[in-house]
Structure formats: structure tokens, C-alpha cells
């Protein structure tokens, strides 16, 4: 009987973490050792056969662990000791494990400190690196330095790959209206048919200006066809590059500082004469660049004068016939000087 009691006491003491656990215990008394005083009574009740394991503590089977248990005694419930019929209720109720069995959850106060250290600002979180002291953080590169670093991937024209092409200069109403009138007149002269499409925003004014240009321009070409042919022969216009070179001759027309409607209408009339030539050599695609060159010379260099004359409204109201003839002579002289027209042209415009 005593041997059985002794085995039960040793088994219970070992499972409860009492003395005699082995090396490293140092002989220290564990909380489970406090039950030694009741070992004989518990063993006696087991031998009788009617006692519940819960009576060992002096309470019911569902009683909670004694309040005297220290935090170090909190352990997972173990199987019943040798000779016991029910689980050992003296062990602390099992706690849910959120980690692997080999790991132990850190206390709450130990977990709060790393969590506080891990808090980063949105910028640091996006950058993907741990926060550093201000003295060690790299300085933010200026915008100009970032642009300079990407300069290694520039295109052949020196612009950045992501740089959009510069926006074209917005064409004002005077330029748009002038280009529409001159371009339509040159196309009509090349094809020999009137364009019946409606004009742009300044429809009424543009339509009247185009009608006036047809009447005056056609007369200039008839009266000075020989001179125009001589100048065209000297200029030897065959392609778009030759058309672009006409800008130099057009600018020379106004080199003396005199501007009037006679010179302007003669310049446009000669452009129509060139457009007919481009049609005959199958270079109709050059007619539009020719119209743009004439418009550029007139609007870009003579804008102030055109504005003072009220633009194409002033052209429609132009009635000074003598000014028209005087302008024609000056234009022919200018073309003769640049294109090298011979004595026949000089006699014509004397």
C-alpha cells in the first residue's frame, strides 16, 4: 500500500513540476510542491475507489486552478498521473497556441515595443527601407539632378524620351483666313475649276476677298504673262525645295520698305502662275507648301500693315488702280534682280 502511495506521489509531483524534475531544477520548490501536504489524503481516496480527482484540491471536478499558482506554473494540461482515472486538474487550463509548438508567444509588453518601432511614415513605407536617423538618411535629389541623370537616354535631337514635342504656335484668325484664301486661289488656278466648298469662320469676308482676288489676279497674269514666264524659267522650280526657296525672293519684294495692295496681289498672282506650272510637271503636292510660304511672308512680316488696312476687308475695298500698276512694276523689278531676268523684262516694266 505504501509503495503504491509513494509512486502516486512521485508521479503527481513530476507532472506538476515539483521537486525532483532532474538536473537544472536546483532543488527549488515549484508551486506543485505545495500539494505534498495532501498527497496521502488523495492517494487514500483513490485506493478507496470512490473519490474524484477534483477532491485532491478540495473542490469540485470543474473547479478552476488555485489562485496561488504563479505565472511560471502555467503549463498545458498533461495526461493523468499513473494510477489516476481523470486528467490532472491541478494544471493550468490549456491556452490556444497561435505559433508552432516549439515557439512561445512573447508577453504583450514585449510585443508592443517592436510594433512601435515598425511604424513608418507613408513616404518611408513606399520607399521600402527601414526608418533611419535623420543624419543618416540620403538627401532628396533636386528635380534638375533627376532630369540630368535621365539625359543619358536622350534622343538624337537632344530631347528626353518622355518629353512631348513642343506645341505648334497657335494660328491667329488673320493667318488662318489668309492661308485659306491664298491656298484656295492657287488650287483653283492649277486645276482650272472653282472650289464651291464653304469658307471658314469668316465666310462672308473670305468669300468676297476670294472673288476680288480672282478678278484682279487673273488680270495681272494676263497682262504680265511674258514676264512671269521669264521669271519662272530663271527660277527653274521643279520640286518642293525649289518652292521653299521662293521665300527669299518674296521677302526681297518688300526690301525697300514699301507695302501696298498692288505688291501683295502681284505676289499672289505670281504664286498662282507657279501653281499652274507645278500642275503640268505632276507636282501638285507642292501647291499647299507654296501657299504656306506666301502666307508666311505676308502675315509674319507685314502683320502691322495688314491690321492697319483692316485685313481682307481693306483688300476688297481697294480701288486705287494706279497703286495696283505701280505695285506690279516694283514686284517685277524685284524678281528681275533676283532671278536675273534679261533686257526684255527690263523694257517691259520701264
Curated annotation (Swiss-Prot):
Q: State where the record puts the cross-link Glycyl lysine isopeptide (Lys-Gly) (interchain with G-Cter in ubiquitin).
A: 5, 40, 136, 194, 197
What does the record give as the function of this protein?
A: Involved in the regulation of apoptosis versus cell survival, and in the maintenance of viability but not of proliferation. Mediates its effects by interactions with a number of other regulators of apoptosis. Isoform 1 inhibits apoptosis. Isoform 2 promotes apoptosis.
After translation, how is this protein modified? Cleaved by CASP3 during apoptosis. In intact cells cleavage occurs preferentially after Asp-127, yielding a pro-apoptotic 28 kDa C-terminal fragment.
Outcome of altering residue 234 to R? No effect on ubiquitination
Phosphothreonine occurs at which residues? 163
Q: Which Pfam families match?
A: Bcl-2
Supply the CDD domains for this chain.
Answer: Bcl-2_like
The name on file for this protein is: Induced myeloid leukemia cell differentiation protein Mcl-1
> Where is there biased composition of kind Gly residues?
50-61
List localization entries: Membrane; Cytoplasm; Mitochondrion; Nucleus, Nucleoplasm
So what does mutating residue 40 to R actually do?
Reduced ubiquitination
The observed outcome of changing residue 163 to A/E is: No effect on mitochondrial localization
Is Transferase included in the keywords of this UniProt record? Answer: no
Example GO biological process term?
positive regulation of oxidative stress-induced neuron intrinsic apoptotic signaling pathway
Q: Where is this motif: BH1?
A: 252-272
Report the outcome of residue 208 to R.
No effect on ubiquitination
GO cellular component: a single term: nucleus
- Subunit structure, as described in the record: Interacts with HIF3A (via C-terminus domain). Interacts with BAD, BOK, BIK and BMF. Interacts with PMAIP1. Interacts with BBC3. Isoform 1 interacts with BAX, BAK1 and TPT1. Heterodimer of isoform 1 and isoform 2. Homodimers of isoform 1 or isoform 2 are not detected. Isoform 2 does not interact with pro-apoptotic BCL2-related proteins. Interacts with RTL10/BOP. Interacts with BCL2L11; may sequester BCL2L11 to prevent its pro-apoptotic activity. Interacts with GIMAP5 and HSPA8/HSC70; the interaction between HSPA8 and MCL1 is impaired in the absence of GIMAP5.
Source organism of the structure: Homo sapiens
Q: What ranges does the record list as Polar residues composition bias?
A: 150-161
